[in-house]
Structure formats: structure tokens, C-alpha cells
Amino acid sequence: MRLATFNILHGRTVADDLVIPERLRQAVQDLDADVLALQEVDRDQPRSHLADLTAVAADAMGAVSSQFVAAISGTPGATWMAATGRESPGTASYGIALLSRYPVLDWQVLRLPRIPAKFPMWLRVPRKIIVVHEEPRAVVVGRFDTPTGPLVVANTHLSFVPGWNRLQLQRIRRYLRVFDEPVVLMGDLNMAGRAPAELTGFTPLATHPTFPLAEPTEQLDHILLRGSLGPVVSSDAPLMPLSDHRALVVDLA
């Protein structure tokens, strides 16, 4: 079984600032994951040519189960509101997606608490402080029928605000307690090193720096396990043709 997580930067390539869905398709084919967690996923956004990037990825990997969960309704960086899951078809949205080559038994969605007020954020380029609203955050959880039995997989993209992302991760840990099956938590947790494993009590399946893309120095993207699966055969953080993150991949026996 191959697990992978990838923050796709809404399909954008940093080098040329272009969103070309075919690049995402090729990247997903190259990852060749059985279960794939994606973050920063666009649907019906003008900046990504109104493409459904979840559908592009699902077709590329041959997924039989996929679920997109919008965190934002509208356009990130412009006019938006927190998504509710009741948006009309065709509404521009942005969020996370979970895809699998295994049949899904059920889906669940958890909306995470967000900072209720605006807060200052330092931009390295240009060097200035701006006041922003924190983006809404969500978790998509799938329970899949795998050859070794039911497997629960959760995908999320946590806040970049130190401390707040820890509270969100603790909320996820409590939410996942109800499952008796092995649980995999994947995603861009915006926390480096062993902090996510220490906060959750989960086992890290891969330890590779994933950010920034060219010469990564921090592991912001994680694949964590509670319970027992097959042993890890290999893991990697491959350079992909898009995004500002590397993907994170784990192969299990």
C-alpha cells in the first residue's frame, strides 16, 4: 500500500506561476498512490481555469473513491466566506481532497475552530505586516475497505499560526478516538519535526523535509499512524512539477 500527501498550491508551479492541470495529472500519476491526501485544492476557480482539480487527480490515479471538502467558498486572497458544505454547484471553492483506489465505507467531515478576529502577519516579500483573517480549516475522514481490512484515513491542512494549529490538532486527535480501526492522519500540518507525533501520540511513518520545494529544510507535511499496519518498506519526499511543497510518500508491505 502506498500512502501520499501533497499540498498542491492550487496546481500552480512556482517557477513560471502557471496553473496547468496536465502537470497535476502527471504528478499524481508519478506518485502512484493507493490513498492520496491533497491540500490547497481548487474547484471552479478562475485562477485554475475553472477546473475540478480533485476530479483531475482522481482520474489520474484511477481512484474509485474521492471526496473534496471546501474550506472556503469564494476566492482565497479576495472575497470569500467559510464553506458550509451546502454550496451550490459551480461555486468557486478551495479546500482539501482525499482519494483512494479502495472503496469507501463512509465519509465524515470535521470543521475546525478558527481564530475569531483579524491578526497581524509578517510577509517576507514584500517586507511588511498585514492584517488578515485566518482561513477556515477542515478535516475529511474516509473509512476504506482495503485488502487488509478497514482503514481510517484523515486529511487536513492546519493553520500556520503557531499555537492555534496545536489546538486544531488536539481537536482532531479527540475526534479520531472513536475509531477502532487503524488510523492514518495525513496532511500539511504547518508544524515541523516531531511536534505532530508528540501531540497526537501517533507514529510518524516518514521523516523527510518537505518545504520549501527546491532545498527543503522543514517537514510541514506528515503521515502519522495510530494502530498497526504493515511495516514501512520505503519513504520519500519527491520533487514534483508543481507547488512550493514536496510530496510525502510511504510504502507499506
Annotate each predicted stretch with a short phrase.
Residues 7-8, 41, 156-158, 187-190, ...:
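Active-site metal-binding loops of divalent metal-dependent hydrolases
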Residues 10-14, 42, 114-131, 155-162:
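Surface-exposed cleft-lining segments at the edges of enzyme active sites
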Residues 100-147:
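Active-site catalytic loop in hydrolytic enzyme cores
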Residues 5, 96-98, 139-143, 155, ...:
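Conserved hydrophobic/aromatic beta-strand scaffold that supports enzyme active sites
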Residues 78-81, 119-128, 204-207, 231-233:
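Short Pro/Gly-enriched beta-strand edge/turn motifs at strand-loop
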Residues 104-109, 143-146, 161-170, 174-184, ...:
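Metal-dependent phosphoester-hydrolase catalytic domains
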